[in-house]
Swiss-Prot record:
Annotated function: Involved in both the arginine and lysine biosynthetic pathways.
Complexes and interactors: Homodimer.
Species in which this protein is naturally found: Buchnera aphidicola subsp. Schizaphis graminum (strain Sg)
Name used for this protein in its record: Acetylornithine/succinyldiaminopimelate aminotransferase
Metabolic or biological pathway, per its Swiss-Prot or TrEMBL entry: Amino-acid biosynthesis; L-arginine biosynthesis; N(2)-acetyl-L-ornithine from L-glutamate: step 4/4; Amino-acid biosynthesis; L-lysine biosynthesis via DAP pathway; LL-2,6-diaminopimelate from (S)-tetrahydrodipicolinate (succinylase route): step 2/3
Cofactor note: Binds 1 pyridoxal phosphate per subunit.
Cofactor: pyridoxal 5'-phosphate
Residues annotated as transmembrane: none
EC number: 2.6.1.11, 2.6.1.17
Residues the entry annotates as binding pyridoxal 5'-phosphate: 108-109, 141, 226-229, 284
Gene for this chain: argD
Family: Belongs to the class-III pyridoxal-phosphate-dependent aminotransferase family. ArgD subfamily.
Location in or out of the cell: Cytoplasm
GO BP annotations listed: L-arginine biosynthetic process; lysine biosynthetic process via diaminopimelate
Length: 404
């Protein structure tokens, strides 16, 4: 038992936790802004943001205050009742998007599960039971529930769990003819990330997204945008779909919405919501007052012109620093993404070295992520300072000098 262990170390994980993860060799114990400290007091500059989650950095003072205040009032009452923070948050999300209805949950997977169920239920009720095909894309990622992992286009995550849910097909990302070859009148939805995250930080082409929208209209299929990773300011717009001037029928968000506190949301229209009756779907913890009070504050802070312009400026600064690094090392073939979701594409021959590079960065005090086989992913706090960017890039440079 944990109580008998005098010292908690990385080895404790190997003894206690189901090995679905392979954590770093150090254990963070404290965070503030874009900095983390481990058990030994070593400081790190965090360019991972908890995988695009800590939108306002670690332990933001406003969120800490809101959490303390709400924790003294009400934690949980279940959805037998509604609550004020949930209704205030729903109103803010609706007023800043295409949507008119919101469903709250706890994770991105739950938000997507709700979206996929909603699409099938709506199509069955409005059209017929055969209209249940969902089209997704290879190299996509939509969560770890059995339904969402099957919709995601990566067999390594969905194989060996038995028969998969039927009527799920995959097309090639950014190739419209691949979609045209499988979409038909039995398609209930097309789901896509506007920037494929796990697939390597690959943005969707504007023309591709617009043609997908037209195909969905043609076949009476719903268009679902999975903005779990891109939503709430990550791309310098509140939602990434604003860059494309294309509206979805259903939108899912999570990660940055709670800046580290578990919350997600599925947004849709009154027309689609009209088929839903009490009991069709639900959640125990979704929309709880604690999560919603924090998310409301996050949206208040992020959803301003000045803040979102700041995200774009920070993105340009990071890319400028990366280009300076690349002039010295010739490490990257491409830097892609939008806002503060950045993919650094390594030369193909360096793909086998990516984990060695990550460890070198850790040792130098910089935390980054991977995305696919040869992409380093940066998804820092949206409030990361210029000082932290410059210092982080200096450490990045030093790490590469030592490992290459």
């Amino acid at each position: 038992m944990i109580g008998k262990i005098k010292l908690i170390t990385r080895d404790s994980f190997n003894k206690l936790i189901l090995p679905v993860y392979n954590p770093a060799f150090f254990i963070p114990v404290k965070g503030k802004g874009s900095r983390l400290w481990d058990q030994k007091g070593k400081e790190y500059i965090d360019f991972s943001g908890g995988i695009a989650v800590t939108s306002l950095g670690h332990c933001h003072p406003v969120l800490n205050k809101v959490l303390r205040q709400q924790s003294k009032k009400l934690w949980h009452i279940s959805n037998i009742f509604t609550n004020e923070p949930a209704l205030r948050l729903a109103d803010k999300l609706i007023s800043s998007s295409f949507a008119s209805r919101v469903f709250f949950a706890n994770s991105g997977a739950e938000a997507n599960e709700a979206a996929f169920k909603l699409a099938r239920y709506y199509s069955s009720k409005i059209y017929n039971l055969k209209k249940n095909k969902i089209i997704s894309f290879y190299n996509s990622f939509h969560g770890r529930t059995f339904f969402t992992v099957s919709v995601g286009g990566q067999a390594k995550y969905s194989d060996f769990f038995g028969p998969k849910p039927p009527a799920i097909m995959h097309a090639k990302f950014n190739e419209i003819n691949s979609v045209k070859s499988i979409i038909d009148d039995n398609t209930c939805a097309v789901v896509m990330e506007l920037i494929q995250g796990e697939g390597g930080i690959v943005p969707a082409d504007v023309a591709f997204v617009r043609e997908i929208r037209d195909l969905c209209y043609k076949y009476n299929a719903l268009l679902i945008f999975d903005e779990i990773q891109t939503g709430i300011g990550r791309t310098s717009k509140l939602y990434a779909y604003e860059h494309y001037e294309v509206q979805p029928d259903i939108l899912t968000i999570a990660k940055s919405l709670g800046s580290g506190f578990p919350i997600s949301a599925t947004l849709t229209t009154n027309g689609i919501a009209s088929v839903i009756k009490p009991g069709i779907h639900g959640t125990t913890y979704g929309g709880n007052p604690l999560a919603c009070s924090i998310a409301e504050s996050v949206v208040n802070i992020v959803n301003t012109k000045k803040f979102l312009l700041g995200v774009e400026k920070k993105s340009k600064k990071i890319i400028s620093e990366l280009n300076i690094i690349n002039k010295r090392f010739g490490l990257f073939t491409e830097i892609r993404g939008k806002g503060l979701l950045i993919g650094i594409v390594l030369r193909p021959e360096l793909s086998e070295e990516i984990h060695n590079i990550l460890n070198a960065l850790f040792l130098e005090g910089v935390i980054v992520l991977t995305a696919g086989k040869n992409v380093i992913r940066l998804a820092p706090s949206l409030i990361i300072s210029k000082r932290d960017i410059v210092e982080g890039m200096k450490r990045f440079y030093c790490a590469l000098e030592k490992c290459l």
